[in-house]
A protein has these predicted regions:
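Alpha-helix initiation/capping motif
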Residues: 2, 7, 30, 60, ...
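A short beta-strand-turn-helix
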Residues: 2-20
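Short hydrophobic/aromatic-rich motifs at helix boundaries and adjacent loops
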Residues: 11-14, 66-68, 82, 100-104, ...
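Short, flexible, glycine/charge-rich loop motifs used to bind or transfer phosphoryl groups or to couple energy/partner
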Residues: 11-13, 44, 164
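C-terminal cap of thioredoxin/glutaredoxin-like
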Residues: 17-26, 40-41, 120, 124-228
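Short, thiol/selenol-centered motifs that function as redox-active sites or metal-ligating centers
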Residues: 27-37
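Flexible, glycine-rich phosphate/dinucleotide-binding loops
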Residues: 31, 62, 183
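Structural alpha/beta surface segment adjacent to cysteine/selenocysteine redox centers
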Residues: 35-120
Length: 228
């Protein structure tokens, strides 16, 4: 189905009948990702639509470079790059591990981690991780057992596969689908604000005709097609 063939689909007049799935691909220790999460939650609080939100940890060579440049770090320093990569990977595994004790605790873990890093300006360390576990009330023994398990690593790899299927190349990236057309979605790489998300959701089918398809990197807004 071509994008032009979707123009006859009209949004339901009842906003409550529309359900949106928002996939925000994040670096758990990235400040820019933290701000985008706040914008997504702001949108959810004020929208009349039903929204399912998914925070998905994702990183690759390019996203690590992006993180280092955003933080004015020397991305040519191999030792520093490896250190940053390890921290992002460990934080991602820790978030996936916390989710095994419930979605609510998983979200609380992510929020507390980002509060400690970006508001209290602490470094990501094993000591900070243990402190966060205690603050939000995770089962500590279970946490460390789960984190070392094959299951958590498999769940993490699934997230990387989802990112690849949705053509995500950087973070933060937000992919939006709705229940009226689950084959096509819109991906945002820039200007991820509550206002922009609201605009996309209100005009999703119109935007599917207007936005270009994902054909190359660094497109700020484009359409992706999911193959099921």
């Amino acid at each position: 189905m071509k994008n032009s063939e979707l123009s006859h689909i009209q949004p339901s007049p009842l906003s409550t009948e529309r359900i949106f799935d928002c996939y925000l691909f994040i670096n758990p220790i990235g400040k820019q990702c933290y701000h985008c999460e706040q914008e997504v939650m702001k949108f959810i609080e004020r929208t009349p639509y039903k929204v399912h939100v998914h925070f998905i940890p994702f990183h690759n060579f390019k996203s690590v470079t992006q993180y280092m440049k955003n933080n004015h770090l020397n991305d040519k320093n191999i030792d520093l790059r490896n250190e940053i990569y390890t921290k992002i990977y460990d934080a991602s595994l820790s978030y996936k591990t916390a989710l095994l004790q419930g979605k609510k605790l998983g979200r609380a873990f992510l929020m507390e981690l980002q509060t400690q890093l970006h508001l209290l300006h602490k470094e990501y360390t094993p000591e900070l991780l243990q402190e966060i576990i205690q603050i939000i009330g995770l089962d500590e023994k279970m946490f460390y057992e789960d984190k070392a398990s094959k299951l958590v690593h498999q769940e993490y790899e699934k997230d990387q596969q989802i990112a690849q299927e949705m053509m995500v190349e950087m973070n933060p990236s937000l992919v939006i689908f709705d229940n009226l057309n689950q084959q096509y979605g819109v991906i945002l790489h820039q200007n991820i604000t509550a206002e922009m998300i609201e605009h996309v959701c209100d005009n999703l089918h119109h935007d599917l005709d207007k936005c270009p398809k994902k054909t190359h990197r660094h497109q700020s807004c484009c359409v992706i097609q999911m193959v099921h």
